[in-house]
Amino acid sequence: MPRRRVAAKREILDDPKYGSQILAKFMNHVMESGKKAVAERIVYGALETVAARKTGTDPLELFEKALDAIAPLVEVKSRRVGGATYQVPVEVRPSRRNALAMRWLVDFARKRGEKSMALRLAGELLDAAEGKGAAVKKREDVHRMAEANKAFSHYRF
């Protein structure tokens, strides 16, 4: 065990437009090479596209609904017991749930075919809010993997 003190968690400031802390965190996930202004433009552009396509809905509410649809409840972790490696299902703590959801959302948005990243992100957000899309499929795959390895749940960490 390291003897050094654990670094204190830095407070994340709310994003300037919507005043949401979770959206500010999401912008940090979208950001590449420290270019925060570009990340902000992408995220706000995606939310404007979502608002234009789904009139009458608050884009921030839809964003949070999409994150909930993507966030996994359980995942598997490898545990080595007597020469065999077992995939042990474990519950995901809330902070990791959000982090995984954001990471998957950005990763699968980058793999989409639309022209700009803002349009890709908007498309993935709309799909996730409706319960479809690649990010939601990833969550279902993770849940299926945990369900298949339920027999090893007594090897908890």
From Swiss-Prot:
A matching Pfam family: Ribosomal_S7
Stored PROSITE patterns: RIBOSOMAL_S7 (PS00052)
UniProt cross-references to InterPro entries, sorted A to Z: Ribosomal_uS7, Ribosomal_uS7_bac/org-type, Ribosomal_uS7_CS, Ribosomal_uS7_dom, Ribosomal_uS7_dom_sf
GO cellular component labels: small ribosomal subunit
GO BP terms: translation
Keywords: Ribonucleoprotein, Ribosomal protein, RNA-binding, rRNA-binding, tRNA-binding
GO molecular function, one term: rRNA binding
Subunit structure: Part of the 30S ribosomal subunit. Contacts proteins S9 and S11.
The family this protein is said to belong to: Belongs to the universal ribosomal protein uS7 family.
Database matches in PANTHER family: RIBOSOMAL PROTEIN S7 (PTHR11205)
Biological function: One of the primary rRNA binding proteins, it binds directly to 16S rRNA where it nucleates assembly of the head domain of the 30S subunit. Is located at the subunit interface close to the decoding center, probably blocks exit of the E-site tRNA.
Name recorded for this polypeptide: Small ribosomal subunit protein uS7
Organism of origin: Pseudomonas fluorescens (strain Pf0-1)
